[in-house]
Amino acid sequence: TNVSELEKIKDEHPSIPYILEYRELTKLLSTYIDTLPTYVKDDGRIHAHFVQTGSGTGRFSCEDPNLQNIPVKSELGQKVRSAFIAGKGKTLLSCDYAQIDLRAAAILSGDENLVEIFKKGIDVHTGTAARVFGVKDDKVTSDMRRKAKAINFGILYGMGVTSLKEGMGVERKEAQEFYDQYKFTFSRLMEYLEEIKAYAWKYGYTTTLLGRRREVPLLKSPLPFLRAQGERIAINAPVQGTSADIIKLAMLDTADYVNEKKLDNKVKLVLQIHDELVFEIDEDIAESIADELVAVLEQVLSKRKLSDLPIKASRTLGANLQII
């Protein structure tokens, strides 16, 4: 039985939590604990392969082994992350883009309400909830924000009312009303998503902000459910692909920064996880360099005059991956 289905009924029988725990333990053991040590080289490090063409959206994929899916949510998974440590005299720095897909959607669509939220520096889910529910930003409740978060992420993947109902945990009538109000509030975003679908139907592909194409052959399928899947791919590809473009520009710009500052022996990019870059840095310069690297990430679009929408990144320093 699918894990997600077992999660829904885990309180209905005392054996189900044990089944879930067993599955987690066997997964951790086979995929990480037993396997990862076999990839360690003589220098004590794992040298994975990052594949430029491993994803249709332009994101890197990682293999031998895949270091982009090291567990992060569970307590046991966090212990696996703690095994990835900085070298002697070094520390790890994580620079993580904040809500980059939604920022990409704001840039591509030009939706005034979404752009306003980011330019004001408001939490995007709080800002969304305030505008959909018609309250001030400081009056948004945690439940309102939770519902806004469900649709913010889902809408970029072609989410409909049925999926929104499940994500919000409400009756269909309430989900429909919320969906309709969201469409009204962020009308330009919704128009843009429809335009993307129409473009994909006409030309067979979509493009990112920097021009990366994603072919959508499923739109030609004789099967309706595959055509619907093709539409969801068409909607998401420009947004997720633009996010991938941005992180790759950040990789280029941070490399330039390191070279210009002559820090190539002190700062090294060691891991890329979609919207996050992980560096290994000499401990004595970590604090000052961390802020400068964040500034580099935040300027990748503005310095190229591609967009004036604020792109924000956060940073965390720590001795291992669990901490950051």
Predicted regions and their residues:
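Conserved "right-hand" nucleotidyltransferase catalytic core of DNA-directed polymerases
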Residues: 1-75, 89-91, 101, 161, ...
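Short amphipathic alpha-helices in soluble, non-transmembrane regions
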Residues: 290-297
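Short beta-strand-to-loop capping motifs
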Residues: 279-283
